[in-house]
Amino acid sequence: LNHDDFARLAANLRPRLHRYCARMVGSAFEGEDVVQDALAHAMEALPMAGKIENPEGWLLRIAHNAALDLLRRRKRRGTADSEDALANIADQASETDARVAATASLSAFVHLPTLQRSCVLLSDVLGYSLAEIADLLDISLAAVKAALHRGRAKLRELVESLEETMPRLLEADRARLRAYADRFNARDFDALRDLL
């Protein structure tokens, strides 16, 4: 992997790395810092890395480790995720989000233990196979399956509890929201403007 190949790889993977890191650390801003740190570490390690069989996995593992480093530093400092910090989190949708992961806000991900969070993000948000996750995290396939099962169950609980506390919309309001979303997705901005 030469520097030009690395630059192309980093550019292509950057959005996925950011999605993963932001959800791991609970902040879009800190996620960006983690991605930058990971890319710097990868660039530094590149000359000594030798032949890299799976460049995407290699870079994701470096980003994963950088996110874990930030979480450890945060824990040592005793920094807790405040409600203010969670309110500032940007939750970007992914083209491969699973149903539960898509409805879970970033604040719900923050409440998962680190291993469960990693497995759910890698599988449901980034689309990695169980074997790839086991390889990336250096754990057994059984451990991945268990963490994924527990993480999804916990996310379901968190999302359901959030839904219970949210006010219910009237059917007319739901219909307006659906119409708005349909027109937006169809890029029919004239019809969208008429709704406003």
What are these regions (language model features)?
Residues R19, D33-A40, E53-N65:
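Structural recognition of an alpha-helix C-terminal capping motif at a helix-to-coil junction
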Residues G50, L60-D81, E157, S161:
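Arg/Lys-rich amphipathic alpha helix in sigma70-family domain 2
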Residues C119-V120:
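A short pre-motif secondary-structure segment
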Residues T114, L126-A143:
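Helix-turn-helix DNA-binding module
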Residues D69, R77-R99:
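Internal acidic/polar
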Residues L141-A143, L148-L196:
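Solvent-exposed, charged amphipathic helical/linker segments at domain boundaries
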Residues N2, D37-P55, R73-K75:
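Sigma70-family region 2
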Residues L1-R19, F29-E32:
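A short, charge-rich alpha-helical start-of-domain segment used by transcription regulators
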